[in-house]
Swiss-Prot record:
PROSITE patterns: RNA_POL_BETA. One of its GO terms (cellular component) is DNA-directed RNA polymerase complex. It comes from Burkholderia lata (strain ATCC 17760 / DSM 23089 / LMG 22485 / NCIMB 9086 / R18194 / 383). Pfam families: RNA_pol_Rpb2_1, RNA_pol_Rpb2_2, RNA_pol_Rpb2_3, RNA_pol_Rpb2_45, RNA_pol_Rpb2_6, RNA_pol_Rpb2_7. This is DNA-directed RNA polymerase subunit beta. Keywords: DNA-directed RNA polymerase, Nucleotidyltransferase, Transcription, Transferase. DNA-dependent RNA polymerase catalyzes the transcription of DNA into RNA using the four ribonucleoside triphosphates as substrates. Belongs to the RNA polymerase beta chain family.
Length: 1368
């Protein structure tokens, strides 16, 4: 088994019973693949597939002018390299994007050419099409300096859907069937039955019309319509009565209205008897061809065809007319014998289309189209061209209607056609096929569709959403281009004169900047990033709205299995509308979610893995991943638990066709991180999944001792860690960068064999948490491609580490853990276990005002030197300064208008020429309730404005850092080159050289070492080939130097050019403060099982309950939090965590007494290979075993995968191994070793009962009391009511509401009440009066009229009622 460099340092013992069949796919693949398909940036223009940008361009181009003599054709597009890299964009507040240029060709035809068109001239040119945001390697976008994510959308797939109203519309509870054809873009077409069984259609939810109007509009006559939907009965008229052609099926179940006889006149069915199968057999046996029917049997039947008098050509009766006595009379007169009527019955052949034809008043195709025109454009006169154009545009024009590849596939599958491709617009037979199925449904044949089935909902990813926006922009451009194309020839225009890129840029900018699906990335920790990118939302444009979404849409559906997580979804109004992709889910070419299954052939599980969509899955019998199989892959059990079409059942192995790949396949990333998930209630698991995303990265991340084995995948795929791009040797490492000398076999010829990784240091995330990377390799380490070189936020040795492992005791403690409160030891705070660093960004801008420019300066009047003490000469705070609320960070003055001066001021001015009062102090200060350390300052200056010293110094530092990188690369390149050179030169014969090298001398190592490296090139060699090689190496080194100099120059140019700032801004300063947040009462904490609580008290270490060996518990939780919540997973985690730590202590004890390596190996083998997944410890060297043991001292990390975790027996074994009987006895453990005797820290007495004690991975959540605590003295007031504002952000007050007033009234506290409602709130004069009185030392309240009363009076007056206050 292969272990990576980091895995060897600390192996996670897995309890999984099943081998890994299928690796978890790259977790951000959906986003990255979708966007790369959209851009196709690295594909040659000629080889691009018709998708993404290419599809958008080809669908709009060529654009032809109105007269048809000029057209603009699309040739290809290209994306330039981005001007700034990701980091620079974040710092400068820019969008990380690249310029999109399209090569277009303007073709002008010769108007004079008499016959076929002749090309007169062709102009080709590259045209700028706007900026296209680029995706970062981690699947996000940088828009205006902030990272955003485009969330995928789950929407109803295009195609045709059949449903009924579940009997809700009509009072009788009758099912009304309907069908809807949904295109990808274009008009929706609905068909629906009304309670009277008449079939209507409507376009885009407008007024409904009989469906036969649509059928006539597509060119069918009433005869053809009836022929399409009915079978006919054939009658031959006799002088009296008629003969009916006998069709057995049509008679079965009917009641005979007359005696039915055979040819000989023998009665087979008596009148008023129901015709059964025996009667039919008798009739068939008698070879009955016709049945004689009486006259009244014909009456009321409906004619299928027009009946025309052969001699006169007169229409006697039309199709769909009822047969009456007069009609029969006319027919006999005209000598017509054969007539056809519609066969209908009440059971499975309803007369719906026939009834609809009767309601329809239109007569022919034109009238039908006019009726549709009137419905679509009421009030407009229907001219012939307009009517035709509108109808064709509705469903037949490719510009206006697009069913899309998916829609066509879904449509054809639903109407049972074999081929899944076809035209992208609606065809006449599509409309007919839909109506036929709908009528069949009404007749009781077939099933309606389930719209929540994942086969009917598809995912639109970034690429597709961006393509739709881009196409919308292009269509806007198309209209403008059409106008101008007419003038292209006369005014000699070039392509760039025709195309204006503004509409495209604005469409793209709007989508990425403010669409509902473009969201501010949740960056609290690596898990929240991954989850955000894997989110699937049913909301957004073209999706559902919160208010309208019912229970069904939100509910878990059987087809979610392995595609969408049934657990992870937000609590609240969005529940079930926002979901997360399951671990192995993947999108197929049509955008439907697929999940992998192992193929089973003859009850033997093969290694073949097939991805099945929800529709395909319904056809197979699928076994669960935990079905027992032997070593040959044969299913052992007589009955296997399996699923077919969403139903679970027990079946014999020979019926199984597929099997799940992994037990964790049904849940999402966050849910699969919860150990013992199978023992938690689903509601609590949902909270646990959601709260892990809110865990704040701790100062020192600590791996969970009980994990699920997916922690490493999460950390690596999130992009928080640094991975080796190529293998090699670590050449240099410090806190800020890692330099790797690449292996020769991985280095590319002519390229620097050096990889430099600059680590991210103390950077602010979107949620103000700290992102910081720490190297975990040492100089000289050999690393392979993909190894973890540095840990990021919330990762420990390349594993996700969201919280800390706490020693937890389940017991009550003086009521301090009442109602989920948490009691914590002071030691936890003192050790900085939950201390987190938060980085705040504070901005100040100097603008150009009407009165003159604002100035950033240290020279501010009326400020004491103490307040300016932390500013440098430019007026900007030093890095490293510790600041409190109200301290000045950046000094800034703003000019203010001339004010009326007092005589004293005039005198002072005359004497001293004092001009200071022209400016007011608008410095940037630390906001209230914040304090911290300044860790970074950035200064941005507009082009053409003198930089201050500080800005210059920042640029110099940046260049120095860059030069260091380049020097390192050069050092390694030269080192390699000179090593190769030395190997080549030693032993060669020289013709001369420096230090008087004689001709014919053999060069040796000593001579070379004596020379300066660069003088080696002056040696003249006798061997011409070697001399040429020497020259080549010299050239390659010089070439590299030249390249590095160019790169440095490029960087310098980028840094020294002015910054792009918003209009009117001259200078902008950003100050970054690092705020250290210790754990304190009021902070919210949680485990991974939805067991959340608030810290109630931090107890001195000596008061905490402690074990017999003196070790105190870290956290005391209430045992009552477990039973009713049904999240027993937390108790199991505590037991297993206790074993993990116990094993760690035993390993630590071995290391302390310097036990033999062999003893260590035996013990580690016992831990790793007695149960669960086997580890290959044989391949480890003694040094590696020693390093592994050192890392295991703090606890042997366990993995208990979801639904495949540790059993009770295995946990017992581990506890026995961790706590031998002597230790167990000393600690007073129970026989199963999961409960311990504890002593009260305050009295030293032993508690009456043993206590469940162990280690749990506990998180601190991003709901910190510091961010929520707030107190107001005097602050802003609302403009109209003059009442204080509310909320911390507005520095608002506390609302004193209706009920609080009642409380004071109840106590009769009249003065308190008066004060609350007047001077403390909105009595403007009273407020100032109280202030004056307080200054004078007089504590009297003069309450006046509250402003809200005046507002009330004004509002009543606005109703036209004259109301006035009688002040007497």
């Amino acid at each position: 088994m292969q272990y990576s460099f980091t895995e060897k340092k600390r192996i996670r013992k897995s309890f999984a019973k099943r081998p890994i069949v299928h690796q978890v796919p790259f977790l951000l693949a959906t986003q990255l693949e979708s966007f790369s398909t959209f851009l196709q940036a690295d594909v040659l223009a000629a080889q691009r597939k018709p998708e993404g940008l290419q599809a958008a361009f080809t669908s709009v181009f060529p654009i032809v002018s109105h007269n048809g003599f000029a057209r603009l054709e699309f040739v290809s597009y290209a994306l330039s390299a981005p001007a700034f890299n990701i980091k620079e964009c974040q710092q400068r507040g820019l969008t990380y994007c690249s310029a999109l240029r399209a090569k277009v060709r303007l073709v002008i035809l010769d108007k004079e050419s008499p016959n076929k068109p002749v090309v007169k001239e062709v102009k080709e040119q590259e045209v700028y099409m706007g900026e296209m945001p680029l995706m970062t390697p981690t699947g996000s976008f940088v828009i205006n300096g902030t990272e955003r994510v485009i969330v995928s959308q789950l929407h109803r797939s295009p195609g045709v859907f059949f449903e009924h109203d579940k009997g809700k519309t009509h009072s009788s509870g009758k099912l009304l069937f309907s069908a809807r054809i949904i295109p990808y873009r274009g008009s929706w077409l609905d068909f629906e039955f009304d309670p009277k069984d008449i079939l209507y259609f409507r376009v885009d939810r407008r007024r409904k019309m009989p469906v036969t109007i649509l059928l006539k509009a597509i060119g069918l006559t009433p005869e053809q319509i009836l022929a399409n939907f009915f079978v006919f009965d054939n009658f031959t008229l006799m002088d009296e009565g008629a003969q009916l052609e006998f069709v057995p099926e049509r008679l079965r179940g009917e009641v005979a209205r007359f005696d039915i006889t055979d040819r000989d006149g023998k009665v087979i069915v008596q009148k008023d008897k129901r015709i059964n199968a025996k009667h039919i057999r008798d009739l068939e046996a008698a070879k009955t061809k016709f049945i004689s029917v009486p006259e009244d049997y014909l009456l009321g039947r409906v004619l299928a065809k027009n009946v025309v008098d052969g001699d006169t050509g007169e229409v006697i009766a039309s199709a769909n007319d009822e047969v009456t006595e007069s009609v029969l009379e006319k027919l006999r007169e005209a000598g017509i014998k054969d007539i056809q009527t519609l066969y209908t019955n009440d059971l499975d052949q309803g007369p719906y289309i026939s009834s609809t034809l009767r309601v329809d008043e239109t007569t022919d195709r034109t009238a039908a189209r006019i009726a549709i025109y009137r419905m679509m454009r009421p009030g407009e006169p229907p001219t012939e061209e307009a009517v035709e154009a509108l109808f064709n545009r509705l469903f037949y024009s490719e510009e206006a209607y697009d069913l899309s590849k998916v829609g066509r596939m879904k449509f054809n599958r639903r109407v049972s056609r074999d081929e899944i491709t076809g035209p992208m617009t609606l065809q006449d037979d599509d409309i007919l096929a839909t109506i036929k199925i709908l009528v069949e449904l009404r007749n009781g044949k077939g099933e309606v569709d389930d719209i929540d089935h994942l086969g009917n909902r598809r995912v639109r990813c970034v690429g597709e959403l961006a393509e739709n926006q881009f196409r919308a922009g292009l269509v806007r451009v198309e209209r403008a281009v059409k106008e101008r194309l007419g003038q292209a020839e006369s005014e000699n225009l070039m392509p760039h004169d025709l195309i204006n890129s503004k509409p495209i840029s604005s469409a793209i900018r709007e989508f990425f900047g403010s669409s509902q699906l473009s969201q501010f990335m949740d960056q609290t920790n690596p898990l929240s990033e991954i989850t955000h990118k894997r989110r699937v939302s049913a909301l957004g444009p073209g999706g559902l709205t919160r208010e309208r979404a019912g229970f069904e849409v939100r509910d878990v559906h059987p087809t979610h299995y392995g595609r969408v997580c049934p657990i992870e979804t937000p609590e609240g109004p969005n529940i079930g509308l926002i979901n997360s992709l399951a671990l192995y889910a993947h999108l197929n070419e049509y955008g439907f979610l697929e999940t992998p299954y192992r193929k089973v052939v003859d009850s033997k599980v093969t290694d073949q893995i097939d991805y099945l969509s929800a529709i395909e899955e319904g056809r197979y019998m699928i076994a669960q991943a935990n079905a027992a199989i032997d070593e040959n892959g044969q299913l052992i059990d007589e009955l296997v638990s399996s699923r077919e079409a969403g139903e679970t059942m027990m079946v014999t192995p020979d019926r199984i066709q597929y099997m799940d790949v992994a037990p964790s396949q049904i849940v999402s990333v966050a849910a699969s991180l919860i150990p013992f998930l199978e023992h938690d209630d689903a509601n609590r698991a949902l909270m646990g999944s959601n709260m892990q995303r809110q865990a704040v990265p701790c100062l020192r991340p600590e791996k969970p001792v009980v994990g699920t084995g997916i922690e490493r995948t999460c950390a690596v795929d999130s992009g928080t860690t640094v991975q080796a791009f190529r293998g090699g040797v670590v050449d240099y490492v410090d806190a800020g960068r890692i330099v790797i000398r690449v292996n020769d076999d991985e280095a590319v010829a002519g390229e620097v064999g050096v990889d430099i990784y600059n680590l991210i240091k103390y950077t602010r995330s979107n949620q103000n948490t700290n992102i910081n990377q720490r190297p975990i390799v040492k100089m000289g380490d050999k690393v392979s491609r993909g190894d973890v070189l540095a840990d990021g936020a919330s990762t420990d040795l390349g594993e996700l580490a969201l919280g800390q492992n706490m020693l937890i005791a389940f017991m009550p403690w003086n009521g301090y853990n009442f109602e989920d409160s948490i009691l914590i030891s002071e030691k936890v705070v003192a050790d900085d276990r939950y201390t987190s660093i938060h980085i705040e960004e504070l901005n100040v801008v100097a603008r150009d005002t009407k009165l003159g420019p604002e100035e950033i300066t240290r020279d501010i009047s009326n400020l004491a030197e103490v307040q300016l003490g932390r500013l440098d000469e430019s007026g900007i705070v030093y890095i490293g300064a510790e600041v409190e609320a109200g301290d000045v960070l950046v000094g800034k003055v703003t000019p203010k208008g001339e004010t009326q001066l007092t005589p004293e001021e005039k005198l002072l001015r005359a004497i001293f020429g004092e001009k200071a009062s022209d400016v007011k102090d608008t410095s940037l200060r630390v906001p209230s309730g914040m304090s911290g350390t300044v860790i970074d300052v950035q200064v941005f200056t507009r082009e053409g404005i003198q930089r201050d010293k500080r800005a210059q110094q920042i640029i110099d530092d940046e260049l120095k850092r860059y030069r260091l990188d380049l020097n390192d690369q050069l050092r390694i390149v030269e080192g390699d080159a000179f090593q190769r050179l030395a190997r080549m030169l030693v032993g060669k014969v020289a013709n001369g050289g420096p230090k008087k090298l004689a001709k014919g001398t053999k060069i040796d190592q000593a001579y070379l070492e004596d020379l300066d490296h660069y003088h080696w090139f002056d040696i003249r060699l006798a061997d011409d080939e070697a001399a040429a090689q020497l020259e080549a190496i010299k050239n390659s080194i010089e070439e590299k130097r030249h390249q590095f100099d160019l790169a440095f120059e490029e960087k310098r140019k980028k840094l020294t050019q002015g910054d792009e700032l918003p209009p009117g801004v001259l200078k902008m300063v950003k100050v970054y403060l690092a705020v250290k947040r210790r754990l304190q009462p009021g902070d919210k904490m949680a485990g991974r099982h939805g067991n959340k609580g608030v810290v109630s008290k931090i107890v001195p270490i000596e008061d905490m309950p402690y074990m017999a060996d003196g070790r105190p518990a870290d956290v005391v939780l209430n045992p009552l939090g477990v039973p009713s919540r049904m999240n027993v997973g937390q108790v199991l985690e505590v037991h297993l965590g206790w074993a993990a730590k116990g094993l760690g202590w035993r390993i630590g004890e071995m290391l302390q007494r310097q036990a033999k390596i062999e003893e260590m190996r035996v013990f580690l083998t016992k831990i790793y290979n007695d149960s669960g997944r086997q580890e290959d410890l044989e391949s480890f060297t003694d040094e590696e075993i020693l390093e592994l043991a050192k890392n295991l001292r703090e606890g042997v990390p366990f993995a208990t995968p979801v639904f495949d975790g540790a059993t009770e027996e295995e946990m017992g074994k581990m506890l026995d191994l961790a706590f031998p009987d002597d230790i167990a006895e000393q600690l007073g453990m129970n026989p199963s070793k999961n409960q311990v005797r504890l002593y009260d820290g305050r009295t030293g007495e032993m508690f009456e009962r043993r206590v469940t004690l162990g280690y749990m991975h506990y998180l601190k959540l991003h709901h910190l009391v510091d961010d929520k605590m707030h107190a107001r003295s005097t602050g802003p007031y609302s403009l109209v009511t003059q009442q204080p504002l509310g909320g911390k952000a507005q520095f608002g007050g506390q609302r004193f509401g209706e009920m609080e007033v009642w409380a004071l009234e109840a106590y009769g506290a009249s003065y308190v009440l008066q004060e609350m409602l007047t001077v403390k709130s909105d009595d403007v004069n009273g407020r100032t009066k109280v202030y004056e009185n307080l200054v004078k030392g007089d504590h009297v309240i003069d309450a006046g009229m509250p402003e809200s009363f005046n507002v009330l009076v004004k509002e009543i007056r606005s109703l036209g009622i004259d109301i006035d206050l009688d002040r007497n």
